[in-house]
């Protein structure tokens, strides 16, 4: 687990467009957050307001994400106007993206948070999971109450994630992961059938079932979104997942930060379990470790893998090396 990254998700019984419009208005933070209260509007997309994790006010800024796949935004926070040190990407997945052809309505909300280890306080680190998880439930209730619901709606799926820091250029990661032939190197549960090239290819899974794996890459804000689709033709079964490849310099607002965060977003049934594809979040996590090892080796950063799954700022690495030399 990447210890500087936090994610929370919810199924919300409202339309994706309704949720998107609601989230784009910073003033609505007053209604569902613990104590983000907007006090003064600076421009169309920026306010000054109170904060749950600080004694002083913050600047809040919202940015719409341009994607043909689904709605998304980013919230940004900082102590000065246009100088933001926290970024919170939000994606809204329609049910038919998760399960093509489904009749389920609503939207799956996913909220990602980064806390720069160079700026974080102990309270932020200890409290962010609790606060954001509760705020996510509050957001769900606010939107569902507007739809006339009196209790929480339950979706057919839930979201789980795996996150790891990769000390290699994000462009190297994109070039490596978009080539389906490289799956034979970093994935251990499938084997290729014949020669592979491009962004789609045929494989056999761990039970010798035929599966076509497709990879698609999209630019999103200052980072990349990678779609991975498993399709079992003999069972007409799809399993889709999404990965965000976010430069550490952007996620932690630190130009000295190298590498990128690999954040994998996966979808699982609330009732029953899959019989094909990846069957547990650890299947994704194991792959991510392999991806990290291969990419860091390609980048010449052979020491990074031993440091674990989390980003460590340059100055902390220098301190550790100094201590280790004495």
Language-model regions, residue ranges each:
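Hydrophobic ligand-binding cavity/cleft-lining segments
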Residues: 1-43, 141-197, 317, 321-326
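Short, surface-exposed coil-to-beta transition loops
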Residues: 5-7, 55-60, 80-90, 159-161, ...
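Short, hydrophobic/aromatic-rich segments at coil-to-beta transitions
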Residues: 41-49, 66-74, 195-202, 219-228
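Short, charged/polar surface micro-motifs in flexible loops or helix N-caps
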Residues: 53-56, 64-71, 81, 207-211, ...
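Beta-strand/loop substructures that line and gate deep hydrophobic ligand-binding cavities in soluble
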Residues: 74-141, 231-293, 302-306, 324
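Short, flexible loop/turn segments with low-complexity composition
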Residues: 149-155, 300-312
